[in-house]
Amino acid sequence: MPDLLLELRSEEIPARMQRKAAGDLKKMLTDGLVEAGLTYEAAREYWTPRRLTLDIRGLTARSKDIREEIKGPSTTAPEQAVQGFLRKAGLSSVADAHVHSDPKKGDFYVAHISKPGRAAEEIIAQLVPGIIRNFPWPKSMRWGPASAKPGSLRWVRPLQSVLCTFGPETEEPVVVDFEIDGIRSGNITYGHRFLAPGEITVRRFDDYVSKLEAAKVVLDADRRKEIILADARNLAFANGLDLVEDEGLLEEVSGLVEWPVVLMGEFEEAFLAIPAEVIRLTIRANQKCFVTRPQGEGEALSNRFILTSNIEARDGGKEIAHGNGKVVRARLSDALYFWTTDQGDLPDLGQLEASAEKFGLDLNKPLDQRMARLDHLNVTFHAKLGTQGERVERIRRLAEELAPTVGADPVLAARAAVLAKADLQTEVVGEFPELQGAMGRKYALLQGEHPSVAAAIEEHYKPQGPSDYVPSDPVSVAVALADKLDTLVGFWAIDEKPTGSKDPYALRRAALGVVRILVEDRIQLRLSSIFASAGACYAGSGADQTRDLLAFFHDRLKVYLRDQGARHDLIDAVITPQSDDLLQIVRRVEALGSFLDTEDGKNLLAGTKRAANILAAEEKKKTAVAKTVEPALFKENAEKSLFAAVNQAEKQAGEAIQNEDFSAAMLALSALREPVDSFFEGVLVNDEDLEVRANRLALLTRIRAATGQVADFSKIAG
């Protein structure tokens, strides 16, 4: 079967757009081909900085002929209805239609439409120009004289050529001929812009790849990544160094070169006085280079970095490395200035005394000065939630309140909360916002803060995603919870909640962070009381907001537990709208899951569900159910045994739950298994004596109540 090769060659495409653009091209073209009646065996996309390529294998040469029947109105229908049918069917008159008869509906018009299949080349030639014109680039441009005309072509960078060939392996492929804004498709591409810029005539994908490789273009982005990583590791090792690997940077750099050549540059060792994170970010952000570290020396960096060139220079890349080194030195000079400036006094100390007094700050300490300035400048956190200074005060109060619960020193928790946002006013964080927290920790240690306070300044942002670590130091935990809970309660109070896929303030991430901290650090916390104290300063906070926010946490907990492998039905069975201790919910789910894995658990579940089903049916029929169980009405020993077992199990399970020993509660309930089985085997619930029936139904309600202390068994599958 024929194969299709398509290449769209342009000026350099931004690296961050390449992967998605290639995927979009594949989806748009394959969807269009299928919609047009073609099928294919496989499709794969490729990309380099200057081209998007699609290789589609086993594409059918022609779409199938289609015979379509369009049913029309009755032959006695009004003229207007008949004319509408003719327009829809593309017929000029009723003479072109057929008349069908139906015993019930009578005679009616039918149009038989035959659509002959189309050649794949024709379909491709029609599809590709439309895809190019409607391509979903985040940003695009117009160029050249034609750009002044309405409707002129837009592309991410000027489009230079389109290659499009089609045909089976056994025949010479043909060029699929079409034109888009003066660019006519062909079988010509071009090699590397500098190393092999000449024309290349292409037949099909295999020789396309090999000819590009000969012309210094590695088409496969994953292979470019492998080349860069392997060569960078080897170059570092040859110089007694280890490469500091960075997957995000590797992805970006592979999108900057068509022919990767790895080189090494260096800078003065004096710059190693700058924190490693700052050096790494400076070199990464500005020069797209990798840093290295001496072999076997921990986290300390070396003064050498690795860059990726797009050309093979005659001097072996010495001038390229030297030029990059000059730029890196200039950037590191700026970073060193930021680093030293942040450790000095601010010029406006005299204006910061009121803020310092408010927060108990020591203006002899650089980080305290930055916090005082953050408050003094009235930096807005959110228009409806006040300034950063007001937010810090809320976090401090909440951290102090949470400290005893999480085992933290309230004084240290308050101090950490006050300094947590101070580094937002530092020069380094102003240049590299992603270092907020990490730089605060370094500055805190430099000014002699308690290690737990310094750690909390960095870790209060944690966890920032499902793969990020959860803080364990009690002071960090107190401030992390306070920060996230203040944010959530505040945005709920002003009614700015996540909707659908929109979550501009990352509230889902904040809630998941609270869930992970409470569950993974095994912290018991009544969220409702924290919501009340955190929301006391908001006019819009109240019982409705508390219920809604608690439901939001339940949703996040369900997502988290399902990702951990928990059964969704067990989670639903345990959670109630009032459940505000997330760790307790998790413990209940764990205990319930273990219990239901046993034979006693499975049988009790079956018996409990049977009792619940009988009760539901009788309650629906409004059958009388006694309010209490009357032992005097028992006729069978199985009734007496079940009643005694329920009384004991209910009492023991209740005591175990009070002690939060959910495994013991399940053990107590397991004693119901045999009495419940015996009851259903030997007792007819719907006795003819209505009083006896009502009493037996009341006994079933006791089973439901006893098990309901742990979970709603009716929600459990099985």
Swiss-Prot record:
Catalytic activities: tRNA(Gly) + glycine + ATP = glycyl-tRNA(Gly) + AMP + diphosphate
Subcellular location: Cytoplasm
GO molecular function (one): ATP binding
Keyword Hydrolase: no
GO CC annotations, alphabetized: cytosol
Any single GO BP term: arginyl-tRNA aminoacylation
Signal peptide: none
Protein's UniProt keywords contain Nucleotide-binding: yes
PROSITE patterns named in the record: AA_TRNA_LIGASE_II_GLYAB
UniProt-listed Enzyme Commission number(s): 6.1.1.14
Keywords, alphabetical: Aminoacyl-tRNA synthetase, ATP-binding, Cytoplasm, Ligase, Nucleotide-binding, Protein biosynthesis
Pfam families: DALR_1, tRNA_synt_2f
Broad EC category: ligase
HAMAP family (UniProt xref): Gly_tRNA_synth_beta
Family: Belongs to the class-II aminoacyl-tRNA synthetase family.
Subunit-level organization: Tetramer of two alpha and two beta subunits.
Name of the protein described by the UniProt record: Glycine--tRNA ligase beta subunit
Gene of this entry: glyS
